[in-house]
């Protein structure tokens, strides 16, 4: 996987329309990526329920993508989970847009709830040319 620089990721996310998507400023997305994956597109983490989280935003195979090994997977983003590990974050961003529109907003991301929610997330884009 590719490890993004902070400002590099901010620029890519902005280009893909995440800034203020569903009311969440760009800093929220960069902060979430930092604490979910440390900006690494190749990150994978297995969960106790047998599902796996994939990519820079740690998108889960029980609901959002298909990895062929998660029983009862819904694959609501209609993608193979491997697509979420690409150095090109388009698939992750498109799926994240679907997730954040699902009703719970960015609360869907535990790391965002724990580390970003209610903080000054603008620090994550400070000094970036955007």
UniProtKB/Swiss-Prot annotation:
Its EC number is 3.2.1.17. It catalyses: Hydrolysis of (1->4)-beta-linkages between N-acetylmuramic acid and N-acetyl-D-glucosamine residues in a peptidoglycan and between N-acetyl-D-glucosamine residues in chitodextrins. The active site is at residues 36, 53. Keywords: Antimicrobial, Bacteriolytic enzyme, Disulfide bond, Glycosidase, Hydrolase, Secreted. It is an enzyme of class 3 (hydrolase). Disulfide bonds join 7-128, 31-116, 65-81, 77-95. One of its GO terms (biological process) is defense response to Gram-positive bacterium. GO terms for cellular component: extracellular region. Monomer. This is Lysozyme C. The gene is LYZ.
């Amino acid at each position: 996987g590719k490890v993004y620089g902070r400002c590099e990721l901010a620029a890519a996310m902005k280009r893909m329309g995440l800034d203020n998507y569903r009311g969440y400023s760009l800093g929220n997305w960069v902060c979430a990526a930092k604490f979910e994956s440390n900006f690494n597109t190749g990150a994978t983490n297995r969960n106790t329920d047998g599902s796996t989280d994939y990519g820079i935003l740690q998108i889960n195979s029980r609901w959002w993508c298909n990895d062929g090994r998660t029983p009862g997977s819904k694959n609501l983003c209609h993608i193979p989970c491997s697509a979420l590990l690409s150095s090109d974050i388009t698939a992750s961003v498109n799926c994240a847009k679907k997730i954040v529109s699902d009703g719970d907003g960015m609360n869907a991301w535990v790391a965002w709830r724990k580390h970003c929610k209610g903080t000054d997330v603008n620090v994550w884009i400070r000094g970036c040319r955007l």
